[in-house]
Amino acid sequence: MTKMNVESFNLDHTKVVAPFIRLAGTMEGLNGDVIHKYDIRFKQPNKEHMDMPGLHSLEHLMAENIRNHSDKVVDLSPMGCQTGFYVSFINHDNYDDVLNIVEATLNDVLNATEVPACNEVQCGWAASHSLEGAKTIAQAFLDKRNEWHDVFGTGK
């Protein structure tokens, strides 16, 4: 397979075992700042996906709440394949801490009573949300917290 420019296109999606959180890449800026991009994979690629209303609400909830747990978050974005998210941190390379930040953020999702910015002024598709869908996705991921480090399902 020819090496592609996009890191995830070089990942053999048939070999990974969701759920997991993996370091997808790093980038160093001219002044020495380092961005660490993580793949938060909720669903098994090409086998299952998150339904859009739940995914959309999960995106809003995670993007808003993750910043309460770390001031190093640059961005949190959904994958177009609807199997996960990317989260980027600046100058923060502690993998175990990233797992704890994601865990705390997903617990915030479970405790949410509304979806932030779920209106036509602040959201581009405000009609497509499901708080309950987001909570279901979050709970399923949290239920497998002990597997998040095991990208290839090897038990290591």
From Swiss-Prot:
GO biological process, one term: quorum sensing
Cofactor: Fe cation
Signal peptide positions on this chain: none
EC number(s) from the headed UniProt entry: 4.4.1.21
Catalytic activity: S-(5-deoxy-D-ribos-5-yl)-L-homocysteine = (S)-4,5-dihydroxypentane-2,3-dione + L-homocysteine
UniProt xrefs under InterPro entries: LuxS_sf (IPR037005), Metalloenz_LuxS/M16 (IPR011249), S-ribosylhomocysteinase (IPR003815)
SUPFAM superfamilies in alphabetical order: LuxS/MPP-like metallohydrolase
Comment on bound cofactor: Binds 1 Fe cation per subunit.
Gene Ontology MF terms in the entry: iron ion binding; S-ribosylhomocysteine lyase activity
Pfam families in UniProt: LuxS
GO CC field: cytosol
Residues binding Fe cation, per UniProt: 56, 60, 123
Enzyme class name: lyase
Keywords tagged on the record: Autoinducer synthesis, Iron, Lyase, Metal-binding, Quorum sensing
Residue ranges of coiled coil: none
Family (UniProt): Belongs to the LuxS family.
Summary of subunit composition and partner proteins: Homodimer.
HAMAP family, A to Z: LuxS
PANTHER family assigned to the protein according to its UniProt record, in alphabetical order: S-RIBOSYLHOMOCYSTEINE LYASE (PTHR35799:SF1)
Role this protein plays: Involved in the synthesis of autoinducer 2 (AI-2) which is secreted by bacteria and is used to communicate both the cell density and the metabolic potential of the environment. The regulation of gene expression in response to changes in cell density is called quorum sensing. Catalyzes the transformation of S-ribosylhomocysteine (RHC) to homocysteine (HC) and 4,5-dihydroxy-2,3-pentadione (DPD).
The protein's name in its UniProt record: S-ribosylhomocysteine lyase
Organism of derivation: Staphylococcus aureus (strain NCTC 8325 / PS 47)
Gene name, Swiss-Prot/TrEMBL: luxS
